């Protein structure tokens, strides 16, 4: 039985071992280079990812509080792959940083919480995992200790996270008071329609998730947090953290509140519309590229919610597929932005005018990533949004798809505006040729292959759909 526990929890165990190993390395030897710390982290993350595709255990432990199956393993593999890419991208930034080991420890701690959160089948484990995945993020947001805006970002992240966690905890308390259980399965079997307290509990939990994924109207400090955080942390917040919460959101909606499907359909549709429109409108007027990507990510959440509104296996598969595509696309863009900011300090959109003149490889990588985020064929972002809209149309809300299509056209303007700056516009102060270290180069190549390959490989969506069923 003990061996079975280890196999079922191999992701969590490897991440925990990596954290403990980094702590020992940090305490025991100050002479170990940051590059060695990065190599240890990346090596063990890669080992966890490989084992995640080789070992395919299914079962429950801890009194059915922790559940593992093929779908949960896929979600964890996606998050680990994204974290590995971010770790590779951050190596240049952390090369001479005094506290590099602490960065990786915090990064892995929040990843550990996300893995537990995905396997949670009990609200107590879910909440504890949520806090484990959230608290280290505040420290990461404040990692540039010498910058005032980094401290401001951390403070705003703490306040918004505390508020959202409080809403969730209050909702969970009401559920426990009316059902007598915190188990997902037992709550789903006990919950009833037209029970005001249970409906209120659902609204509170939904609002808590809304804060975590930056859906409108719960998005207010998102851009400030993204702008003030280091680029590596911003990319982690926008992709990995948001992806993990969306994975759990699928489980809670479909497994716990399936009885309320008719009610949460309209709620999700309304929130998705506001999220798309407001995210797009604010993205149009941004000059800082990190704030731009913040509102871009808010708009993308609107599309994800449209796909989720279908409430079927197709919906779940389309959301997971889009998150895979979004990880490659967003991290590809952030990889270039991190390099530019780290070496030049520039983060204004106009700073990218004439970028292609001296940095052809980086320009193509950023251009492909932006094409994917815009949903332009044949890159993967087009197919990701196509599957989301197809799922959203399952209930016949073609007007919703029409509004989403209009928003896609609007988003083309601000994505292609950056592409125009890179490839067409000229500047007397264009960015000089930037050196690319081997690890960030590997990360960027992985992202480009992922963006192109996941779009051309039709079997990926089918693979995800089979696991969902």
Predicted region positions:
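Alpha-helical transmembrane segments of multi-pass membrane proteins predominantly involved
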Residues: 1-469
């Amino acid at each position: 039985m003990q061996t079975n526990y280890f196999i079922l929890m191999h992701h969590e165990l490897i991440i925990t071992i990596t954290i403990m190993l980094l702590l020992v390395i940090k305490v025991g030897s100050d002479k170990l280079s940051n590059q060695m710390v990065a190599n240890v982290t990346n090596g063990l993350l890669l080992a966890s990812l490989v084992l995640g595709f080789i070992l395919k255990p299914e079962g429950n432990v801890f009194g059915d509080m922790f559940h593992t199956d093929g779908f949960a393993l896929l979600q964890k593999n996606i998050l680990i792959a994204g974290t590995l890419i971010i770790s590779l991208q951050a190596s240049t930034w952390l090369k001479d940083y005094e506290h590099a080991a602490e960065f990786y420890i915090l990064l892995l701690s929040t990843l550990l919480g996300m893995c537990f959160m995905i396997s949670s089948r009990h609200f107590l484990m879910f909440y504890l995992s949520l806090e484990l995945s959230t608290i280290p993020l505040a420290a990461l947001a404040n990692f540039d200790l010498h910058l005032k805006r980094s401290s401001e970002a951390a403070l705003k992240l703490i306040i918004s996270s505390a508020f959202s966690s409080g809403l969730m905890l209050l909702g969970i308390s009401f559920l426990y008071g009316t059902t007598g259980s915190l188990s997902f399965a037992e709550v789903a079997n006990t919950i009833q329609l037209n029970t005001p307290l249970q409906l209120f509990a659902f609204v509170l939990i939904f609002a808590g998730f809304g804060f975590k994924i930056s859906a409108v109207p719960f998005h207010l400090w998102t851009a400030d947090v993204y702008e003030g955080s280091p680029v590596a942390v911003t990319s982690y917040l926008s992709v990995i953290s948001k992806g993990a919460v969306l994975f759990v959101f699928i489980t809670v909606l479909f497994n716990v509140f399936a009885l309320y499907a008719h009610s949460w359909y309209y709620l999700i549709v309304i929130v998705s519309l506001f999220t798309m429109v407001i995210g797009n409108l604010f993205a149009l007027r941004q000059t800082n590229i990190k704030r731009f990507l913040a509102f871009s990510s808010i708009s993308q959440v609107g599309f994800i919610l449209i796909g989720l509104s279908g409430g079927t296996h197709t919906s779940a598969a389309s959301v997971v597929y889009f998150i895979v595509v979004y990880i490659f696309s967003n991290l590809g863009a952030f990889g270039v932005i991190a390099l530019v900011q780290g070496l030049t300090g520039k983060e204004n959109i106009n700073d990218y005018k004439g970028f292609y003149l001296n940095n052809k490889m980086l320009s193509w990588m950023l251009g492909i990533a932006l094409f994917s985020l815009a949903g332009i064929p044949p890159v993967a972002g087009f197919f990701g949004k196509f599957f989301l809209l197809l799922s959203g149309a399952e209930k016949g809300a073609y007007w919703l798809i029409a509004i989403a299509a209009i928003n896609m056209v609007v988003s083309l303007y601000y994505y292609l505006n950056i592409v125009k700056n890179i490839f067409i516009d000229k500047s007397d102060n264009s960015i000089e040729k930037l050196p690319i270290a081997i690890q960030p180069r590997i990360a960027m190549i992985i992202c480009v292959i992922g963006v192109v390959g996941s779009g051309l490989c039709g079997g990926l969506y089918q693979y995800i759909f089979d696991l969902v069923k």
